[in-house]
A protein has these predicted regions:
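Conserved RNase H-like, two-metal-ion catalytic cores of nucleic-acid enzymes
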Residues: 1-117
Length: 118
């Protein structure tokens, strides 16, 4: 399987269509939101693609990324997204809408187990 990896500097292209369900993951320097900066966001439509957005840490101006994350018509899948969403809200100044967190879903569906990763 070949994965199409795209590196985007500072923001997504305006005309990028990833469909109505995407996976999202953030990378930051630590878990303290006010101290540890958000460095990049990874997004995939699940169709052998990976879009890596290297954020401009001097201003975090990423209007196309913000538009995607706040779009309530697009499902954003996270795994244990609490820290991701806290960093996104703090640095990108946007609310992430229509979220599915796989760790929470696992806890709801598999209440007999304590093993849900992370």
């Amino acid at each position: 399987m070949n994965i199409d990896i795209k590196l985007h500097k500072y923001d997504l292209p305006e005309d990028l269509d990833l469909g109505n369900i995407i996976a999202v993951d953030g990378e930051f320097m630590g878990l303290n939101v006010k101290r540890d900066p958000l460095c990049l966001i990874q997004i995939s439509s699940g169709k052998s693609d990976a879009h890596i957005i290297q954020l401009d840490r001097s201003n975090y101006n990423a209007p196309n990324l913000n538009k995607l994350l706040s779009n309530g018509k697009i499902v954003k899948i996270f795994h244990y997204g609490r820290a991701d969403m806290a960093h996104i809200k703090y640095y990108l100044k946007t609310e992430t809408n229509n979220i599915l967190d796989t760790k929470i879903a696992s806890k709801l569906a598999r209440s007999y187990s304590d093993s849900h990763s992370l």
